[in-house]
Amino acid sequence: HRSITPGWVLHNYPSVEFVIKKLRHTPCLAGCAYCNAQLDVHRSLTSLFGYDSFRTYEGEPLQERAAQAAVEGRSLLAIFPTGGGKSLTFQLPALMAGLSVHGLTVVISPLQSLMKDQVDNLAERGITEAVTINGMLDPITRALAIEKVQDGTAALLYISPEMLRSATIERILLARNVVRFV
């Protein structure tokens, strides 16, 4: 299990996550060993996904730029063709934030089959920090997914838009450091 900031701390001291992010998820000096190991998109691409490089489009490193922008906390819009690597542009930064600040990235998708495919594809790569919570889950699978979000094991949460109305989802999101909505 990962150590996450307790919900009561987030509620009573909301700036604590800002301080943690500044210390653990903001690049500092060139040559910093921590930043080179934890905040470098190329190293993380290799260590987390096993890829040597990002895809390019007509010689432009669009996938890398999108991933780097997300790591830096910037808002972005990435438009790639089907199968062009859009998912990596949010999955890589999400996993990096999960490791550095125990952050949670919430991915909102209306397609339950797509959410399941995303989680299954990550699991096939040995990445177990992604879960989905939707109305099609049996109670045991749902409870296990909620537990992974609550205890900080999950860095990526895939939910459908209607799940945002759920009191359970609201409660678990308020108790976590949500770093990005996709």
PLM feature segments, named:
Residues E72, L95, D120, L137-F181:
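Conserved helix/coil segment N-terminal to the catalytic DExD/H
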Residues G31-P81:
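Conserved pre-motif I regulatory segment
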Residues I79-G84, T89-A130, N134, G152-A155:
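Conserved SF1/SF2 helicase motif Ia
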Residues S53-Y57, T82-G84, T132-L137, I159:
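Short, flexible loop segments at the rims of nucleotide/cofactor-binding pockets, characterized by
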Residues H1-C35:
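N-terminal accessory nucleic-acid engagement/regulatory domains that precede
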Residues W8-P14, L173, R180-V182:
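Structured, non-catalytic alpha/beta "coupling" segments that mediate domain-domain communication
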Residues T56-P61, L88, M136-I140, L164:
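Conserved phosphate-coordination/catalytic loops
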Residues T46-F49, I127, V149-G152:
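Conserved NTP-binding/hydrolysis module of P-loop NTPases
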